[in-house]
Amino acid sequence: MTDNLPEVREAQEWFRSETRRVAPITLDVMWDHFLSRHWSQLSPDFPLQEFVCYAREQVMTILPDSPPRFINLNNYLWSEQWLVRYRDMDFIQNVLNGMASRRPRLDALRDSWYDLDAHYDALETRFWQFYPRMMAQASHKAL
């Protein structure tokens, strides 16, 4: 949903040539980091932990009809509290390394961590530029 936003396309250009191919994946993880980190500002009336419980309940209703790999992934993500833990950059690095380990074609995800680190402040600025606009569009079903 975010890949075609001008701020996101600009951020993809900040990745080095050897990691640019995985920039969309890395940026999706990074946007989740900022979402988790700034949740209390973005949703002051719905604490993150309550949202996680609510979201889990919603997903659990579709799990019985889902493929086994999706079920296993969800069981792991929920039990490990990923969205809550995304606020920690060390966890983000572990997530990228884990993805790279599971998918050899995505090995560049390991090194994309350095692009995030080098451009952290600029990425956070871009997040604040597009996220409120994206949420307004979503609330009007204009995405």
Swiss-Prot record:
EC number in record: 3.1.4.14
What keywords is this UniProt entry annotated with? Fatty acid biosynthesis, Fatty acid metabolism, Hydrolase, Lipid biosynthesis, Lipid metabolism
GO molecular function annotations of the record: [acyl-carrier-protein] phosphodiesterase activity
Write down the chemical reaction(s) this protein catalyses.
Answer: holo-[ACP] + H2O = apo-[ACP] + (R)-4'-phosphopantetheine + H(+)
Q: Which GO terms describe its biological process?
A: fatty acid biosynthetic process
Matching entries from PANTHER family are given as: ACYL CARRIER PROTEIN PHOSPHODIESTERASE
Q: Which family does it belong to?
A: Belongs to the AcpH family.
State what protein this is by name: Putative acyl carrier protein phosphodiesterase
Q: What is the lineage of its organism?
A: Bacteria, Pseudomonadati, Pseudomonadota, Gammaproteobacteria, Enterobacterales
The gene from which this protein is expressed is acpH
